[in-house]
Each structure stands twice: as structure tokens, then as C-alpha cells.
Amino acid sequence: MSSVNLSSFIDMLRLGCNNIAKNYEYINQLNVFPVPDGDTGTNMKVTITEAIKKLENEKSHIKSFSELGKNFTRDLLLFSRGNSGVIFSQIMKGFFSNIIVNKTSNNSELSIEDVANAFIVAQEVAYKNVSKPVEGTMLTVARLISNEFKSQKNRPKTLEKLFEQAVKVAWQAVKKTPQMLPVLKASGVVDSGAYGFACFLEGMLSYYGGESNLDDNTLSTIEIKFNKFKEQHANEDEFGYCTEYVLRLGLKINQTVEKQKFHQKKFESKVNRIANSVVIASDKDNGFVKVHAHTLKPHLLLEMGLNYGEFEFVKIDNMNLQVNNKNNSPTKRVLKPAIVATVPTEAFAERIREDHDINAILCTDDTGAPSVFSLLEAVKLTNSSNVIFLLHDKNYFLSANETIKQLKHQKINADYVITANPVESIAALTVFNSDLSIHTNVKAMKRFIKEFASATITQASKSYKENKVMVNKNDFIAVTNKSIIASESQLTDCFFKTIDILSKKVKKPEFLLAYYGKDITEQDAKKMQALVEKKYKLFCEFSPGEQKVFSYIIGIQ
């Protein structure tokens, strides 16, 4: 087969998604520490599954590879989670970039040449859009596949053989990742993101094996949880009118009125000034535009459309009738800075809500790292034009950075503070002052974190050696700044040794904050607290964190 049609290629993308879904738990375990706490598999699974679900809903409206590329790459970025999800979205953005430009007609097919060139551009765009490309990751997989197809003589005669070759190179690249990243070699694992990308390509290849195996179960709904605040205020953005219409471009009822030439970007810019939840899809071949938006001024939205043509269909629903209509207009955004926080569990979220009256909180245990979409939705909940993202994992940086870029277009100022764990986040919140500026708050929070010492304690799943610390399987280990600082066969000994080390980093340590995980009972936590208070004369606070991986997350100040 020398080409592939649109429907078949969508099936190939879905098979790639399925293969990641089948392997995500194993991908999660390909982490560089002896604890299987990675979430690369979850992040990649959620990223592509949500994009494929959106694609399935829109499939009947997609008539060309160009439309497919625009929709799919857009949704990949919106739903991307963690570094792996964002980087994967950039690889696919590159893959579709030339296809979007060249394959705009209906019933077009992708040739061997199209796909080979797509793999080449995928690498170029991904490396360009990732600020600090690291070899030994999925970027390396994209680069080596690109190099393979740059030579015409390496291009097979069929698409099946081309994907076989791409998958072969991908797995070869995966095997090379430990040689490129010493931390992978020391741990005896390959890079999880590279493995996930290879799984995706292998899934696409399976289309040619004659077994589609399109399992609807892999596309089961994955809901983003915004905690109780989202439930209480789910309807705030629904005030106004849901306005939809189909506009036939250039059509004139009144022949004396001249119609303007339609420019989608300019039109979108105008619509976004008076509406949200905006979706505008144009079909230039058939000369019409579909518009969907939520606005308080539907008459203005209709007037905008009439500048370019006439309506074939109009539908306006009053959303106020479906919600509590005591407020008839949206609340203006406040100037005081607000916090959007990420935490691993509901227990941490509840603590932050109670102590700091912060409600825009995203729990990541079930959904993986926050996507750009989920962060944007959380910002809406703050109702503030000045926002600080408080992130408990540095792997969330790319999503936060992309969100900040998008918020600039909405005239919302945003910055971020990254902590090593949720205990550091809770500590940083003690110096947050909503009467001060974003800049002042971010500076104060970062300074406080530097004076705060924290670590996570868990049980090793394999033997390991790092620097001068020897870890045996099932040892309890303490980790800070991705370095193992203590390893003991008994949990109490590890806890004490961790306190000794952390106390040296803090001037006059007085207070210890500890959150215990699901593997620790309340009774055991109380016993540990009593032992610590007796030995160290520290004021201690032990609380349930309900985290899955870590027995304890502790901080000293």
C-alpha cells in the first residue's frame, strides 16, 4: 500500500492511543529512582486519549487531512500533561505542519513521501519548540527517525514498510537512551517518554497487521477534578447566551449592502472580545463558517456575522434559565493575586482550603499532571486578573509556561512557583499575602522555600547505589532534590536519619510537618510523632496525606 486515506489514518492514530493505554502502567514504572512513582505513562495516556475522544466526536465534520491536523494538534496541546505530554504534542504538531498546508482537499491521501517528510519535520519543530532539548528522551526517537528518512534510498516502497522501519528505529533509539542519560544507565532502565512514543508508533503500525482491535474501553471518560470548588461553581461561566450559527459567506439578502472579505483570525479576535467558549470552524471550499460562543451580547455576535454573509441557521439559548439567576451579569475580575495550586491528593487540597481559603486546586493522583486546559479552567475559578501557579512538581513547568502565554492574550498576569513536594507548597503559602503584588509574593515564596528543608520517605523496589548511599531492595529511603540522603532497613531509623540531615540545613529548627501516606495507619503515625517529639524536642504536626507512593513527606523549619 503506497498511500492511506483519512479514515484509515484516524484509525491508525486511535490504535497508537490504544497501545499507550495498554502499556501506560509499565511506562510509569520506567523511572530513574528505585521507586515506581513515575507518571509518564499516565500523562501520555491522558493527553492522547482526550485528544482522540475529541477527534471521535468531530470525525464526521473532518473532511481533509488539513482539518484533521489542525484539530488533533490543537487538542493534544490543550489536553497535554507533564513534560511528556507537552513534548509529544510538539512532535505531532511538527508531523502535521506540512500536511495542514498541503492536504486541504477532501478525499486526499497521504503518500509515502508525505509521511516520510512528516517524520522529518516532526523532529525539526519539536526541537525548536522545546527550550532545552535533552537527548535520551522521546526527542531522540523523533530525531533518529527523521535522520532515517532524510535519505531517499532509505524510504521503502510501501507505507507498511515505512512504519515498520520507523518502529524499528524507534525501539533502537529507546535502547540507546541509557547511554545518553547516565541516570537511566545507573538505574538500569530506558527513558519512559521514549518508550511511550515507540508504543504509539507501534500501535499505528498494527493497523497493517489486519487486526484493528479498536477497543472503546480505552476511550472511557477521564474527568478532570477541580475539587469541591468546581462542583459549587460549575455554572458560573454559563451565564449569558449559547449562540450558534452557520454563515454563508458572501451571500446577500439586501443587494445594496456590500459584504466584507472573511479573514478567520481577525474574525476570531473580534468574537473573543465579547464571548468565551468560542469555536469557529470554516469550510473555504463550500464557503461557510460555523460559529459557537457563549456571550452576554448575542446581538453583537450576529451583527459581526452579517458583515461577511447571511445566516443559514441560528440558535440562541438563554443559559441563565438553567442556573441560579440571582446575578444577571458576570463578576468583574479582581486585581488581588490568587493562587492556583496543584496537589497529589484530596487530603492536601482540604488542608489548603481550610488554612488559606484557596479553592482553585487540582488533584493530580487520578488525572496525572495538569494540562493547559485544566490550568486555564482553574484560572477561571479564581476570578482574578493576577494569578500565581503553585506547582508541587517541576515536571508541570511546560504546561504552566504554555498556560501563562495563553493568559497574556486574555490580559491576565501570571507567574509560577515550583516546589519539590506538596509540603513545601503548604509552607510557601504561609507567606502569601493577597494585598501584595504577584512579583512580591513569588519572590517571598521562593525565598521561604530556600529556608525550608523537606524530603520524601518511601520503600525501595530494587537495589540501587547512588554516590555513597547503598540501597537494598525494601529499604526505606529518604529523597530530597532527587538525591537519596538516607537508606535504612527500618522506617523509624530512616525517619530519624532524615531529620538529622534536614536539621543541618535549617537555622534553629523548631517545627516539623509530616504527612503520612496510605501505607501508614493513624496509630503508627501517632507512635512516630511521639518518638520524634521525645528525641528531638520539636513541635510536630502529623496529618494524613493519603499519598500512594510515599510513606511520609516531611518538612522542617
From Swiss-Prot:
GO terms for molecular function: glycerone kinase activity. Residues 7-206 form the DhaL domain. Pfam families: Dak2 (PF02734), FakA-like_C (PF13684), FakA-like_M (PF21645). GO terms for biological process: glycerol metabolic process. This is Uncharacterized protein MG369. It comes from Mycoplasma genitalium (strain ATCC 33530 / DSM 19775 / NCTC 10195 / G37) (Mycoplasmoides genitalium).
